[in-house]
């Protein structure tokens, strides 16, 4: 609605449905929402911040507006850690734009005074209330912890956005940006939105890569550009047939892009033109095979016992089985989350505490999974403490079940320290120290 008020008159009967379609048919917006992640919810607060700041220049101190900005900022920080990168970049660019405008209007003194009266107390309250959060963020080496997820810097992440959003989506966003920059009434907002998203992306990609849900820190920019394009395509001064045709073509693209992301068998294509996001809603064909595994767990374990399933490939993981049977929610605690990433998961003591451990023959698999498979599938100081029970053929892979027969001894502990020596050199607190703490606890 704000854009409608700033841009040449448009046909709102077409404009508003198109804007709604841009959001609800956007695969990147739907991916975290369909996976129970709060990232999409955070966009509500980002939108409030952007909207309230769009035409506010700190010429006065309208406290209802300022309180709303403060509340939205506070809530957005709580939503997801990576939204802080967008907050930092947005406010830096916004403040710079406001001060430049104040210099041009010769009101720098009063503008700066009002800005400090609001920003200083707000910063003190937010930092004070969220001190543990900020302390953790400032003292944590995320580049080290998330090193296993890091897929390269800014350039690689730009290419990643090409795959995630698709070429057509990015071209449409670029067209919307050109239109908003062309219109003087929206030029400043377009520059702030573009610079804020660019800054957020540069800051974030120094330590992490933009995954499916982290990419939503760019959503304010993408959506503003697409909304601007919708306003351009539905201008009232355009010929009705041309306006309707343009809106129809955009709507068809949005539907096709969304439909392709559903990954329906035989009805999707892999192309850079469309989003690579997968909203796969098809039913698995291996549920009977998976049921054999979960039935074994339910039959041979009590609810206070656990089973460790050591796999993270071929569409399987421990959590795949844990959540595969809604009729038995106790599986969610009986089947342990698999440890696969060295920098975040560390040594899986679950292989020692669980009644059964299930592994595969993928002994060369990277991270933690492969070495644990090897420890049980070959002769090792660990294998002597397990006995083979049964096996479960799955889709393209076999799961071998072993029962733990004895507590770990010093020889087994030293064996795993040697196996994970490379990881232990970087993260001793979650490898050798964790092993030592466990061994002390069972003595």
Residue ranges with predicted function:
Residues 1-25, 44, 189:
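Transmembrane-helix signature of polytopic, membrane-embedded enzymes
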Residues 26, 83, 246-288:
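Transmembrane alpha-helical segments
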Residues 87-97, 102-103, 111-185, 198-208:
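Transmembrane-lumen/periplasm boundary regions of multi-pass, lipid-linked membrane glycan transferases
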Residues 2, 44-56, 87-99, 172-180, ...:
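Transmembrane alpha-helices and membrane-interface helical segments
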């Amino acid at each position: 609605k704000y854009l409608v008020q700033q841009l040449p008159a448009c046909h709102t009967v077409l404009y508003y449905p198109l804007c709604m379609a841009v959001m609800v048919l956007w695969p990147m917006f739907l991916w975290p929402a369909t996976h129970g992640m709060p990232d999409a919810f955070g966009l509500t607060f980002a939108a409030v911040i952007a909207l309230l700041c769009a035409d506010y220049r700190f010429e006065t101190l309208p406290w209802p507006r300022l309180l709303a900005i403060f509340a939205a900022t506070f809530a957005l920080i709580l939503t997801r850690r990576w939204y802080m990168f967008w907050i930092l970049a947005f406010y830096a660019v916004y403040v710079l734009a406001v001060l430049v405008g104040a210099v041009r209007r010769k009101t720098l003194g009063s503008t700066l005074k009002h800005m400090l009266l609001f920003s200083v107390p707000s910063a003190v309250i937010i930092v004070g209330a969220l001190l543990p959060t900020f302390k953790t963020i400032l003292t944590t080496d995320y580049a080290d912890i998330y090193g296993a997820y890091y897929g390269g810097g800014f350039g690689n992440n730009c290419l990643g956005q090409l795959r995630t959003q698709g070429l057509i989506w990015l071209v449409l966003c670029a067209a919307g940006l050109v239109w908003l920059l062309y219109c003087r009434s929206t030029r400043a907002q377009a520059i702030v939105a573009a610079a804020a998203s660019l800054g957020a992306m540069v800051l974030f990609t120094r330590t992490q890569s933009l995954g499916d849900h982290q990419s939503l820190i760019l959503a304010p920019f993408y959506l503003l550009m697409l909304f601007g394009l919708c306003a351009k395509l539905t201008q009232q001064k355009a010929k009705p047939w041309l306006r309707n045709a343009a809106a129809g073509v955009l709507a068809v693209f949005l539907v096709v892009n969304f439909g392709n992301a559903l990954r329906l068998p035989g009805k999707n294509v892999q192309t850079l033109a469309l989003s690579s996001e997968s909203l796969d809603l098809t039913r698995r064909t291996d549920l009977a095979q998976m049921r054999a595994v979960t039935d074994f767990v339910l039959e041979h374990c009590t609810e206070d016992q656990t089973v460790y399933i050591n796999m993270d490939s071929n569409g399987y993981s421990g959590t795949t089985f844990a959540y595969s049977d809604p009729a038995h929610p106790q599986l969610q605690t009986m089947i342990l989350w698999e440890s696969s990433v060295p920098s975040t998961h560390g040594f899986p003591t679950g292989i020692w505490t669980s009644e059964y451990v299930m592994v595969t023959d993928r002994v060369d698999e990277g991270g933690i999974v492969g070495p644990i498979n090897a420890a049980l599938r070959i002769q090792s100081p660990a294998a002597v403490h397990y006995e083979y029970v049964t096996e479960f053929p799955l889709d393209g892979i076999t799961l071998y079940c072993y029962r733990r027969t004895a507590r770990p001894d010093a020889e087994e502990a030293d064996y795993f320290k040697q196996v994970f020596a490379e990881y232990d050199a970087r993260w001793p607190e979650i490898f050798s120290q964790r092993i030592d703490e466990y061994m002390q606890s069972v003595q």
